Amino acid sequence: GSTGDGYALARAAGHTVTPIFPALVPLVTREAWVKDVQGLSLRNVRASLCHNGKKEQHFFGEMLFTHFGVTGPIILQLSRRASELLAAGVQELSLHLNLKPALTHEKLRDRLDRDFAKYEQKHLHNGMMDLLPKCLIDIVLSAAQLSPDSIVGHISSKQRECLVRTLQALPLTIVGTRPLSEAIVTAGGVATREIDPRTMASKLVHGLYFAGELVDVDAYTGGYNLQAAFS
């Protein structure tokens, strides 16, 4: 970390400094249920960031629930765009989690029907044990407006369709990011058009050079940002 004085010094030298905001940063959700599953790590899921019904970005991989929201590799990758939109004044964003991205809607429905045939006389919560981590089952059922105490055999075809849709787009509302002090990378900085890329020298002030986070360069992982600084 740093004091951030470099940005003020760059401005004083006449340089343009683009808006600063956290990137590669955990996201804060409105939903309180994340606290009930904090510490739960999911692998092979797809997270999609949406705004006004439009999918902004999506990434496949691992994520982690926390007491404040979500983090992990795919969340950090999405966070740059989320943070940019929030910094621009967007009040909230939608995050859709596809918990079974390897299956098409039809194949997931077939899988659900097979499980439900096997657990026909059991409560719905127990009928989902082969599909989801135990602590996540009731959350998904609630999002699909289903009771965990319902009998599996009583779940209608329409309700099953709703459950499949929920499994492939479990909704979360993004209302913020963790503070800049917790971010891996800072987005924004001294405009690259004002820097000579061969020497990193200022095009405006002789003898002034820039490097690292001070420059308006960032990417999806910390490794890329380290390489940019070293280069």
Name what the model sees in each region:
Residues G1-T3, L9-R11, M63-F68, L208-F210:
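Short hydrophobic core segments
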Residues P26, V70-P73, V185, V215-Q227:
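Glycine-rich phosphate/pyrophosphate-binding beta-alpha loops
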Residues G1-S2, V28-A32, V152-Q159:
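Short beta-strand to alpha-helix junction loop
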Residues Y7, L24, S94-H96, L124-D130, ...:
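Domain-scale detector for complete catalytic domains at protein termini or as standalone homologs
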Residues G1-A13, V217-S231:
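A conserved FAD-binding loop/helix module that cradles the flavin
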Residues G1-D5, P73, L103, K107, ...:
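Conserved active-site and cofactor/substrate-binding residues in soluble primary-metabolism enzymes
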Residues D138-D218:
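A glycine-rich dinucleotide-binding beta-alpha-beta segment and adjacent secondary-structure elements
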